[in-house]
């Protein structure tokens, strides 16, 4: 009798735990740094020829990944990196304005990163692409619950991070390369 009661209690706990998950559906978030950019104008440069080629390679590489939403920063280089994939998928990329950290302008303000993560989490079960910057992608991965938070070299443009979010604050990060080096 005790064994039967324990089994029933265990089953009830499993059911309660399942409902306590807030119907969270796993999602995959693809994150890339913008493609290679021109040196001028310094404020908001477009992509170099190599960057345009890389953005087209990204579109080819991710076209079958089931991406439903694309987020970029307000800068031309992120929008131009996302544009070929958005066009191929019939999507419009959503731009999120990133603000600099007041104590260190080379870093992104935490509230900007939180806004990106909140937008991602508003899309349960959807695969999302985020095109960002070397100083924003690691923070987004960390806030998604990534188990590995990379440092992105300023001279590298070929990293693709795939973050599988299993539950709030629990995620697995896979890093791979795409396009030519």
Predicted features by range, described:
Residues 23-124, 137, 143, 148-181:
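Active-site-proximal alpha-helix that buttresses catalytic centers in soluble enzyme cores
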Residues 131-133:
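Short beta-strand segments
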Residues 1-23:
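Bacterial Sec-dependent N-terminal signal peptides
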């Amino acid at each position: 009798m005790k064994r039967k009661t324990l089994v029933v209690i265990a089953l009830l706990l499993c059911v309660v735990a399942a409902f306590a998950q807030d119907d969270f559906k796993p999602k995959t978030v693809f994150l890339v740094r913008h493609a290679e950019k021109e040196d001028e104008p310094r404020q908001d440069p477009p992509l170099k020829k190599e960057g345009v080629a890389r953005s087209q390679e990204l579109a080819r590489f991710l076209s079958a990944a089931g991406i439903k939403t694309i987020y970029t920063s307000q800068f031309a280089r992120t929008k131009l990196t996302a544009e070929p994939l958005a066009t191929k998928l019939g999507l419009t990329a959503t731009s999120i304005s990133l603000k600099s950290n007041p104590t260190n302008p080379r870093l992104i303000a935490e509230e900007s990163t939180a806004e990106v993560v909140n937008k991602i989490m508003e899309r349960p079960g959807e695969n999302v692409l985020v095109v960002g910057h070397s100083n924003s992608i690691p923070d987004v991965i960390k806030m998604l619950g990534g188990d590995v938070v990379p440092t992105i070299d300023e001279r590298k443009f070929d990293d693709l991070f795939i973050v599988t979010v299993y539950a709030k604050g629990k995620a697995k990060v896979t890093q791979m390369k795409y396009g030519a080096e």
